[in-house]
Amino acid sequence: MDLIQALAAELGKDPRHVENVVHLLDEGNTIPFIARYRKELHGAMDDTSLRTLEERLQYLRGLEERREAVKKSIDEQGKLTDELVAAIDSAKTLAEVEDLYRPYKQKRRTRATMSKEKGLEPLAALLFAQERDCLRPEEAARDFVDPEKGVETVEDALQGASDIIAEQISDDAAIRKSLRALISRQGQLVSRAATEDDSVYRLYYDFTQSVARLQGHQVLAINRGEKEGILKVSITLDREQALPLLRRAVVKPGSAAMEFVKSAAEDAYDRLIFPSLEREVRNQLTEQADEGAIGQFALNLKPLLMQPPVKGKVTMGLDPGYRMGCKVAVVDGTGKVLDTAVVYPTYGERQKNEAIAALATLIKKHGVEHIAIGNGTASRETEQMAVELIRQVNEGSAHVSYMIVSEAGASVYSASKLAAEEFPQYDVNLRSAVSIARRLQDPLAELVKIDPKAIGVGQYQHDMPQKQLDEALNGVVEDCVNAVGVDINTASPSLLQRVAGLNGTTAKNVVSYREENGAFTSRAQIKKVPKLGPKAFQQCAGFLRVPESRSVLDNTAVHPESYDAAKALLDLTGHTLADVKGGRLADLPDRVKAYGEDKAAGEIGVGVPTLRDIVSELLKPGRDVRDELPKPILRTDVLEMKDLKPGMVLTGTVRNVIDFGVFVDIGVHQDGLVHISQVSNKFIKHPSEVVSVGDVVKVVVLEVDEKKKRISLSMKQAK
């Protein structure tokens, strides 16, 4: 089965579409560009499917390279047979290839290699053959006693032969494959306490679970506990299940050497095979858990980045703190800093009242409409102060509301070189207040400045393979930025470098060109940016918006290569570009439908998927896909934990989705947990089947433990 067929079968896709995507990737096209502008070639796969395909393509190509390297190595030893070539070529995983290569690998000195050096290989071969007329092992071994070679006795000779046979059995690919499968089906992971002290790992102090039923979060927690020296972990398998399988594979009844080989097989299992497979299975469990956790991290990150912006509103950002006070920044509707301050609401009643007065003055002076409060240290006290402040100012003509904003990564950003370049005139602490305000206004534009790992919506992210995690999360950020589109005249270099086809250098060049020549007035002008060649322009053009352009198409996701098609469609349906600008296209979908989609697509020279995208963009030039998502919950009052009672029905925002449940912000300082058993009335394997980060959900309070600061919630009982 060739590469294309293998990918198509594995992913359940049309081989023609898979082949087209492979060609597009090999030509240097980006995933966002392929997903958006080459739908006809891949059957409208989404960006997630395309990234999975790209990942599997890299794996299978790596597998093919390893196959060739292994065959070459064995061939150089003069041991490559047609059967071995066929076995290597049909191996589906790297583990299978390595099993086949194992007998031919250069080995460190082992008991078997030392026995071979003593000339005991012929004895091992004689006994392992188990011919019916074979001599008894003790008799066969007499001829191999040679004190000069270190074989002093018959027992020494037999021990050496047994070591050689044991290693040969251990290197058998078919045996390893069968036993690996047996451990995966029947093996158990056992975790025991390595200390008597209490810890966060107490759940795993006396824990046994089938390998097949282990959850990813359990594996990652156990691994961390083991790494910290708190847990002792092992894989167990009933020896009496494994040995019969081994005996059937290597023991030939009726031979005088049968019992000797049986004993060597048991030694192979205990000393070589099981310890090796235990490590393999542990590694495989970790890889699967890492893969699942990275996937969940990516799944959680996307809705966080895609939170609807609160556009055009003057916003006050509060970065709470105790010793250093509460840092304050007021930004206008475009995110430009208007004012900054530091207040001390936690120092006492007098200072709190002074803080309220100072903030009320800022609200009145700048017409603040929203307050964004960071959720870190002293957030609770700051929120209570903000509610008092809002009550006071809203008694007049103001209509101020607030929202708790995740400040994950804000301190890292505020101390970064990027923040220093953006706000050289402001103290590090005030920069984080600006970032918090902007996170409410446009979460995506602000969060792209931060390493995705610092945004804090994953489990055990520091334990995962960082390269794999970075690739997955950067892919999510890239997909989100390109799905939304970027205003080329206001975007920061951090945002621009996430646009398909651009990088750090070309993003800075775009900003430099903008500063030297003024705002871009057309997409065509982008071609003048230094080091931004034709390929980069092709990839990025459709994702960059130019609101100042005289052509309305430059402020849509219609790619310049489809401008002629868009104009032809307007002609075909009796419309003009002026109608697009004036929002007079309400009947466009009906006119296209009446004309016939296939016929219209054929006449304007595009496929039906592209036709539909053009229609969608012409209807709403400059649209932001995030505006169609549930709006963030802005509050004017605060709930205390003591106010919560079982049975209360509340509305909240999903903050995190993990293997065992969902964390929901219900307006109390502590997020509540909806255990997986309380997420849905139907059986689900993972909460992400039902809910995503950022979703607004109804919940019922089940239990409140003020002492432990735990809130148990139910989604299914609220339905």
List the predicted regions and their residue ranges.
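Short, ordered loop/turn segments at secondary-structure junctions
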Residues: 37-39, 128, 238, 320, ...
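Long, highly charged, low-complexity intrinsically disordered interaction regions
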Residues: 3, 61-79, 89, 412, ...
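Generic start-of-chain signal for non-secretory N-termini
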Residues: 1-19, 26
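Single-stranded RNA-binding regions, centering on S1/OB-family and related RNA-binding modules
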Residues: 546-550, 554-719
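A glycine-rich phosphate-binding loop feature that marks nucleotide/adenosyl-phosphate handling sites
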Residues: 181-188, 318-322, 376-378, 404-412, ...
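Structured, non-catalytic alpha/beta "coupling" segments that mediate domain-domain communication
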Residues: 73, 87, 98-101, 225-238, ...
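Duplex nucleic acid-engaging cores and interfaces of nucleic-acid transaction enzymes
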Residues: 49-52, 59, 63-317, 321-426, ...
